[in-house]
């Protein structure tokens, strides 16, 4: 069965056909590192994790990139509360995000690029747009001219005339109200962070003095929001990719503007498939940091554990409405208890019987193969994790029926059931069945980070030969190291 996905660009569920039949380029718009990650972020993380795992299962070489936005006015608003500068606050929440991802048993993306590490690439992309007549400079800021891109609005299904404005234009710098900033002159204005500040934060003027700024052909300034993802996706994947995933709230303006600036610069379709994860809701509204109605990932993992949370988040398809409540989390706990107990009973029954037993239960064996087929059909149907979970629950019921109804067990049938729990429940859904190795991948990433820290210390101490040796040893293990002005990055 061919994988089909719901493509926001076309509004249709359509067959997935990658540019390269052997590989998939997947980009996920990650979070802004200004607050503790919450369950709304976790919903996106876990669904993209399953997408990547399933594409890998289908035989593709998956190149998965997920950005972490570490330059933003909301981050500046937290100065004095979670760090002494914008960069400090960002580092604090970047680390928390990585820790939270690990706690949810996420497979590691190939790279987690930060905006602060890609300013030269951003400037290069802005210059290309100016040279091609798609952008213009005004008083040190650079804006994208939406009227220069004929297909503007194709992702969100609206026209330029439908859009009244994008961002403030107090200086009257824009040619069209819908034009958006690619580069912002100067630093951060205290007025821009006032609504995001907490009482514990530093005074606005003091916080803004810590904001990161960079030199550019147009003077000192900061990147615009939308240009960042285009530059990072092109840097780490290609000018045209297969799948771009993000939250439903990003369709407009963020993803619409990504399409416009990327395709205007390259003349190529930026992403062939746009997949959008519906937001997690609580009491009829989205869960978000700005609304203050969120449950942090760290608190949720501590209270419920990663398997209950993954079960909760995957019990609803990524395109469907999902609601957090005491009732829905209790349902997830009951569902996980059934799944884990079914797996344990299958393992225990296998241990109690001779592998060469002649007992055959065709009902069990048929149920196992039916569950496998149903699971595969579900994931091939737009990564439908709800139906995939149902297939595993049906498998659990079949195992219970067999164990409860027989004095002698069908070893081969039970062994196949155990393999299915581990391969599909563990390897694809990321639940704790058997030996899922994604935790090993996360640990490997932590070890690489540690080695790079030591290598950077050696370089700063002038021990360049030893630093080069560490780099060579990493590359011999398949870790590509790239040195940038903001420190080393790597990809596995």
Swiss-Prot record:
Q: Which GO terms describe its cellular component?
A: cytoplasm
Where's it mainly located? cytoplasm
UniProt-annotated binding residues for Zn(2+): 29, 229, 254, 258
The protein's matches in Gene3D superfamilies, at most eight in alphabetical order, are given as:
Cysteine-tRNA ligase, C-terminal anti-codon recognition domain (1.20.120.1910), HUPs (3.40.50.620)
| EC number per UniProt | 6.1.1.16
Instruction: Name the Gene Ontology biological process terms.
Output: cysteinyl-tRNA aminoacylation
Task: Identify the residue span(s) of motif 'KMSKS' region.
Answer: 286-290
Q: How is the cofactor bound?
A: Binds 1 zinc ion per subunit.
Recorded catalytic activity of this chain's protein: tRNA(Cys) + L-cysteine + ATP = L-cysteinyl-tRNA(Cys) + AMP + diphosphate
What are the required cofactors?
Zn(2+)
Entries under InterPro entries matching the protein: Cys-tRNA-ligase (IPR015803), Cys-tRNA-synt_Ia_DALR (IPR015273), Cys-tRNA/MSH_ligase (IPR024909), CysS_C (IPR056411), Rossmann-like_a/b/a_fold (IPR014729), tRNA-synt_1_cat_dom (IPR032678), tRNAsynth_Ia_anticodon-bd (IPR009080)
Alphabetically ordered keywords of this record: Aminoacyl-tRNA synthetase, ATP-binding, Cytoplasm, Ligase, Metal-binding, Nucleotide-binding, Protein biosynthesis, Zinc
Residue ranges for motif 'HIGH' region?
31-41
Q: Where in the cell is it found?
A: Cytoplasm
Q: What class of enzyme is it?
A: ligase
Q: Which GO terms describe its molecular function?
A: ATP binding; cysteine-tRNA ligase activity; zinc ion binding
Superkingdom, natural source: Archaea
Give the matching Pfam families: CysS_C, DALR_2, tRNA-synt_1e
Q: Report the record's disulfide bonds.
A: none
Give the family, as the similarity comment puts it: Belongs to the class-I aminoacyl-tRNA synthetase family.
Which HAMAP family does the record match to this protein?
Cys_tRNA_synth (MF_00041)
> Could you identify this protein by its name?
Cysteine--tRNA ligase
What is the native source organism of this protein? Haloarcula marismortui (strain ATCC 43049 / DSM 3752 / JCM 8966 / VKM B-1809)
């Amino acid at each position: 069965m061919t994988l089909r996905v719901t493509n926001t660009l076309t509004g249709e569920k359509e067959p997935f056909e990658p540019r390269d039949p052997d590989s998939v380029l997947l980009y996920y718009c990650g979070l802004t590192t200004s607050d503790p990650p919450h369950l709304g972020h976790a919903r996106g993380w876990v669904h993209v994790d399953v997408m990547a795992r399933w594409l890998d299962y289908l035989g593709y070489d998956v190149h998965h990139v997920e950005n972490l936005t570490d330059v933003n006015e909301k981050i500046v608003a937290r100065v004095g509360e979670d760090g002494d500068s914008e960069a400090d606050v960002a580092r604090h929440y970047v680390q928390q995000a990585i820790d939270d991802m690990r706690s949810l048993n996420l497979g590691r993306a190939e790279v987690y690029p930060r905006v602060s590490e890609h300013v030269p690439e951003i400037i290069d992309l802005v210059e290309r747009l100016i040279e091609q007549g798609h952008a213009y400079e005004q008083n040190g800021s650079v804006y994208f001219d939406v009227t220069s891109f004929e297909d503007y609005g194709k992702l969100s299904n609206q026209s330029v005339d439908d859009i009244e404005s994008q961002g403030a234009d107090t200086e009257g710098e824009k040619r069209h109200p819908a034009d958006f900033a690619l580069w912002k002159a100067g630093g951060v204005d205290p007025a821009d962070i006032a609504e995001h500040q907490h009482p514990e934060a530093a005074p606005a003027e003091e916080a803004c003095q810590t904001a990161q700024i960079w030199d550019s052909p147009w003077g000192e300034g900061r990147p615009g929001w939308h240009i960042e993802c285009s530059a990072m996706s092109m840097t780490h994947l290609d000018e045209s990719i297969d799948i771009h995933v993000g939250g439903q709230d990003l369709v407009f303006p963020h993803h619409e503007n990504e399409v416009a600036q990327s395709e205007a610069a390259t003349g190529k379709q930026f992403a062939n498939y746009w997949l959008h994860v519906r937001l997690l809701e609580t009491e009829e509204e989205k869960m978000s940091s700005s609304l203050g109605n969120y449950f942090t990932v760290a608190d949720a993992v501590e209270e419920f554990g990663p398997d209950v949370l993954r079960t909760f988040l995957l019990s609803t398809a990524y395109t469907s409405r999902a609601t957090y409540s005491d009732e829905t989390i209790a349902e997830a706990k009951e569902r996980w208890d059934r799944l884990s107990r079914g797996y344990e009973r299958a393992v225990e029954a296998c241990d109690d019987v001779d592998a060469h037993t002649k007992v055959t239960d065709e009902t069990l064996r048929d149920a196992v193969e039916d569950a496998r087929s149903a699971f595969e059909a579900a994931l091939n149907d737009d990564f439908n994790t709800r139906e995939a979970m149902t297939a595993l629950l049906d498998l659990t019921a079949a195992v219970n029926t067999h164990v409860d109804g027989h004095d002698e067990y069908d070893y081969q049938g039970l062994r196949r059931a155990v393999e299915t729990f581990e391969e599909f429940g563990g390897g694809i859904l990321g639940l704790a069945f058997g030996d899922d190795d994604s935790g090993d991948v996360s640990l490997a990433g932590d070890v690489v980070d540690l080695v790079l820290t030591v290598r950077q210390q050696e370089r700063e101490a002038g021990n360049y030969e030893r630093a080069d040796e560490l780099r060579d040893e990493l590359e011999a293990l398949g870790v590509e190291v790239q040195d940038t002005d903001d420190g080393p990055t790597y990809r596995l």
